[in-house]
Amino acid sequence: MSNHKLIEAVTKSQLRTDLPTFRPGDTVRVHVRIVEGTRERIQVFEGVVIKRHGGGISETFTVRKISSGVGVERTFPLHTPKIEKIEVKRRGKVRRAKLYYLRNLRGKAARIKEIR
């Protein structure tokens, strides 16, 4: 077996199949497992997906939310076991793959139309 086939087989076994399909513009709730010392808890991060990057085992997505008037962005690896689950709250209608322009918009201007 060649190296490429071996790497492909190993990464294919590591991919998660239990995650929903979502795209940039969707509002999602990401349930992340946080380890603090010996304790473990679930933290929920809810916001708009502004980008998806990469493919395969190294695919990531970035979620943006406004917390206390400050924009917070967090990038998650898609296939990490630290993600407990992802809930899609709203489907957004956008015409771009990367929604970086949302960083400059405030309030109602930063809203995204919902797909019916």
From Swiss-Prot:
- Per the similarity annotation, which family is this? Belongs to the bacterial ribosomal protein bL19 family.
The keyword Transport is annotated on this UniProt entry: no
Its recorded name reads: Large ribosomal subunit protein bL19
Under the cellular component aspect of Gene Ontology, which terms does the record hold? cytosolic large ribosomal subunit
Domain of life according to the entry: Bacteria
Organism for this UniProt entry: Staphylococcus carnosus (strain TM300)
Name the Gene Ontology biological process terms.
translation
State the taxonomy lineage.
Answer: Bacteria, Bacillati, Bacillota, Bacilli, Bacillales
Keywords tagged on the record: Ribonucleoprotein, Ribosomal protein
The record's annotation in HAMAP family points to: Ribosomal_bL19
Q: One GO molecular function term?
A: structural constituent of ribosome
Q: Which Gene3D superfamilies match?
A: 2.30.30.790
